[in-house]
From Swiss-Prot:
The active site is at K195. Its main location: cytoplasm. This is Glycerol-3-phosphate dehydrogenase [NAD(P)+]. It is an enzyme of class 1 (oxidoreductase). It is found in: Cytoplasm. Belongs to the NAD-dependent glycerol-3-phosphate dehydrogenase family. Keywords: Cytoplasm, Lipid biosynthesis, Lipid metabolism, NAD, NADP, Nucleotide-binding, Oxidoreductase, Phospholipid biosynthesis, Phospholipid metabolism. It comes from the Bacteria. NCBIfam families: PRK00094.1-1 (NF000939), PRK00094.1-2 (NF000940), PRK00094.1-4 (NF000942). Catalyzes the reduction of the glycolytic intermediate dihydroxyacetone phosphate (DHAP) to sn-glycerol 3-phosphate (G3P), the key precursor for phospholipid synthesis. PROSITE patterns: NAD_G3PDH (PS00957). It catalyses: sn-glycerol 3-phosphate + NAD(+) = dihydroxyacetone phosphate + NADH + H(+); sn-glycerol 3-phosphate + NADP(+) = dihydroxyacetone phosphate + NADPH + H(+).
């Protein structure tokens, strides 16, 4: 592989970052995958697969592993960041002085900035400046299915039309991976954060034993909360009927591959928050996202009762069943109400 002519450098060698790197390489592109732990990267190189997360998917020959950040960033102008949302800003500040002058950045991170609840576009602008083209990809994607080449579709939004076109061409594969462009940069980002929260609620509902009717009602009203918050932030409401909204919401709320859903199920069954997190064994993005989405909703004066009750369970010690009964006991109202 040419050391400075890769199609994409992927920052983050977890399950999703690895799956996206494999997908790009399988599309015939030269790809560099960087991980922060040199020992982990050495293991990936030795095994030519991610044994911990994707043991049955060998790396294509065009996928190169790299533990030196400067070398990885010099390899391509296109940088795909796939790290947890709570370290997103830190990672961008780390890569800023090492990026090429012509660099363009896209992220697959879902969530908001820890503590502040800011959109990741604002974090990126603060860290990288106003000139670099930015993009985000989001949608219903479990890493194992994506890496296995099973049919998957996502949304792509960018601040730069040329970058959006280039990314769509790089990622799109007619056999298995559809990439839909969407001009709504805010909406595509927001959907991925809110769905994590609602997925915890769906898991709680199933853990309590409420059944399919309750789960479906929660998903539907969760979509209403997502759309309500999006409208307050200036997003296009139709975005939330697409891959980054409804698509990701349904997937995460209904399939046990979702860590957020499994986490919620444990809470619904009576397990405490810390024990449930420990049992999952990986980052549960929805735990932090709940606090961040609630903060954002308060800032913009948006009522989000499901999010509020999930927050009460996660951070205030409220019982999951009690939270569900609080929601069921709310006053009657028009389904189309903004409250």
């Amino acid at each position: 592989m040419n050391q400075s002519n890769a199609s994409m450098t992927v920052i983050g060698a977890g399950s999703y970052g690895t799956a996206l790197a494999i997908t790009l390489a399988r599309n015939g592109h030269q790809v560099v995958l960087w991980g922060h732990d040199p020992k982990h990267v050495a293991t990936l190189e030795r095994d030519r697969c991610n044994v911990a997360f994707l043991p049955d998917v060998p790396f294509p020959d065009t996928l190169r592993l790299e533990s030196d950040l400067a070398t990885a960033l010099a390899a391509s102008r296109n940088i795909l960041v796939v790290v947890p949302s709570h370290v997103f800003g830190e990672v961008l500040r780390q890569i800023k002085p090492l990026m090429r002058p012509d660099a363009r950045l896209v992220w697959a991170t879902k969530g908001l900035e820890a503590e502040t609840g800011r959109l990741l576009q604002d974090v990126a602008r603060e860290a990288l400046g106003d000139d670099i083209p930015l993009a985000v990809i989001s949608g219903p994607t479990f890493a194992k299915e994506l890496a296995a080449g099973l049919p998957t579709a996502i949304s792509l939004a960018s601040t730069d039309e040329t970058f959006a076109d280039d990314l769509q061409e790089l990622l799109h594969c007619g056999k298995s991976f559809r990439v839909y462009s969407n001009p709504d940069f805010i909406g595509v980002q927001l959907g991925g954060a809110v769905k994590n929260v609602i997925a915890i609620g769906a898991g709680m509902s199933d853990g309590i034993g409420f059944g399919a009717n309750a789960r479906t009602a929660l998903i539907t009203r969760g979509l209403t909360e997502m759309s309500r918050l999006g409208a307050a932030l200036g997003a296009d409401p139709t975005t939330f009927m697409g891959m980054a909204g409804l698509g990701d919401l349904v997937l995460t709320c209904t399939d046990n591959q979702s860590r957020n859903r499994r986490f919620g199920m444990m809470l619904g069954q009576g397990m405490d928050v810390q024990s449930a997190q420990d049992k999952i064994g990986q980052v549960v993005e929805g735990y932090r996202n709940t606090k961040e989405v609630r903060e954002l909703a308060h800032r913009f004066g948006v009522e989000m009762p499901i999010t509020e009750e999930i927050y009460q369970v996660l951070y205030c010690g409220k019982n999951a069943r009690e939270a569900a009964l609080t929601l069921l006991g709310r006053a009657r109202k028009d389904e189309r109400s903004r409250h």
